[in-house]
Amino acid sequence: MRTFHRLPRILAITVPLAAIVATAACGASTTDEATAASTPVATAAAPAPVDGADGLVSQNRLGVGAAQTAAQAALAKCQADGLGFVTVSVVDRNGNVQAMLRGDNAAQHTVEAARQKAYTAAAFGANTSDLSERAKGDGATVADLPGTLFLAGGVSVKSASGSIAGIGVGGAPDGMQDQACAAAGLDAIAGALG
């Protein structure tokens, strides 16, 4: 068997094994009986399907129009409050950015802060101001999770199926000001959430 010295160890094992499995699936013989008996082959049994399940998962998501509306309403609220230096981010349940608006005078750090607050709210299904207590304490806490930010300024967007998105605002001098702007974004799309 040819080995791949420059590949990580898992690839050096996986690539030849994949070739053996693929060839065997086509009905061809890949080795003689002696070699086949001494070659370990990993197998995995698929779990039995659940009655009526077809293997697909449906997820509700905000449409691009609703995401833009929420971002615009949140930024408009901040601007009306004299906070034109914030960034607003709307993300889906998995943290993928659906809409982002950066105020004219927003610093670069506000971009990531808004995205992380939005993701935290979406992932936990709660406003980040309510979650901040969970991030306190000695030792490991939820605050150690990558991509999260447990500061006020993120609101969860929910439908009947649960949390589907998050709206985050970053850059105001106080997190509750960020939170008020994010809440204005949520209010702007509340009627579309059903």
Each PLM stretch: what is its role?
Residues 1-4, 26-27:
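N-terminal acidic, proline/glycine-rich, low-complexity intrinsically disordered segments
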Residues 27-194:
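Flexible, solvent-exposed loop/hinge segments and secondary-structure transition points
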Residues 3-14:
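Bacterial N-terminal signal peptides that target proteins for export
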Residues 16-20:
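Classic N-terminal secretory signal peptides
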Residues 21-25:
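C-terminal motif of bacterial Sec signal peptides marking the signal peptidase cleavage site
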